[in-house]
Amino acid sequence: MVLVKAGALVDVVAGTVKKGQAILIENGVIKEVGPNLVAPAGTRIVDLSAKTVLPGLIDVHTHITSQPEDYYADRFRRSPIDIAVIAHVYAKRTLEAGFTTLRVVGADEYIDVALRNAIDKGKIPGPRLKVAGLAIGSTGGHADFTGFSPYLRFELFSGVADGVDAVRKLVRQNVKFGADVIKMIASAGVLSEEESVGAPQYSFEEMKAICDEAAMWGRKVAAHAHGTEAIKRAVAAGVASVEHGSLIDEEGIRMMKERGTYLVADVYNDDWILAEFAKMGYPEKILEKERKIGLLQRENFQKAVKAGVKQAYGTDAGVYPHGMNGKQFAHMVRWGMTPLQAIQSATVNAADLLGWTMVGAIAPGKYADLVAVDGDPLKDVTLLEKIPFVMKGGEVVVSR
């Protein structure tokens, strides 16, 4: 058994901070939480009495198997095998940053499934993963390889499907090969070469077919959706979360609030993209889309927060280097959240979106996934950018 002594503990469910708490852990699961716990003989003590302890953090929008280096080389010289042999490094780096659970929303060749399985079996270190396999998108859309010669073929990596029957089949294929969640491309994107970032890329009927098929297999759907109409189609079709949500309007906000749909807004990575992507050879068309949409996304995120739309923490990690996931907390606070709300988005809210009752809070029956910081993150949320203590399943990952 393990007893963790916490100087302060953030109860993300109650929204309070409790002083002088202890956490008793057995077989990687929290057994008891409270003051003055008596540890059985032989219990290992982890003294965090000078720190504030929080649940392990959750990022629900990551691409843990990739990280951009060069726009064209990434497409023409990097194979799925290259990606597979480096993905475990990104996973370890993210875990050490305090993110003990991730949702992976799209990966080539089901590499995310293999990574999840290896982590679950204890073969490599990494966060707990919920994975999507291939992102499902339309021909010529954000999930397709656009902007290249028609003589180049990318079918090997493709999640492209058109029409109700084809998208249903691809949902089934993803489930067959191990997907925990379904990722749907509802609108055009920023980091691809379509013309309009807001344009819908599936009809309502196709979106509804994806959501219905996923539900039949017990899977939730995450919708990549920047554009106003695409967001509303996706919400009406029954998605669990809208990813990005950059151009959401008042009607879309109302629909999401009424249906309890989560917004997953990656409000940090605009800074990184504009600072670094030109150096990596990204086309001007892509950079111009980012310049136009970054501020709009943050302003609309602020409106959604104010309106009470459910928020879950998702950063699009893999667009920027893995392990920097904590950078987004400060941006969320800058654009309308309290520090507590930002922390809840990365703990209890994210767990609710995932449908994973074993993560997201410090309570009996949950995995002993903990992080600790020096100071009070409810006063200075930037403390979560460099976390000195990480525990996953009762095992210390980082202590510095």
Task: For the regions a language model picked out, list residue spans one by one.
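Metal-associated gating/positioning segment near the N- to mid-region
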Residues: 51-121, 139-143, 147, 205, ...
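Histidine/acidic-residue-rich catalytic or RNA/ligand-binding cores of hydrolases
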Residues: 69-72, 192-194, 231-237, 267-282, ...
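His/Asp/Glu-enriched, well-ordered alpha-helical/loop segment
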Residues: 77-78, 216, 220, 284-285, ...
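Alpha-helix-loop-beta-strand connector modules within alpha/beta enzyme cores
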Residues: 117-135, 197-223, 260, 264-267
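Active-site gating loops and adjacent loop-to-helix segments of metal-dependent hydrolytic enzymes
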Residues: 65-83, 92-95, 139-155, 189-204, ...
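Divalent metal-dependent hydrolysis catalytic cores, especially in the metallo-beta-lactamase
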Residues: 86-112, 125-135, 179-192, 220, ...
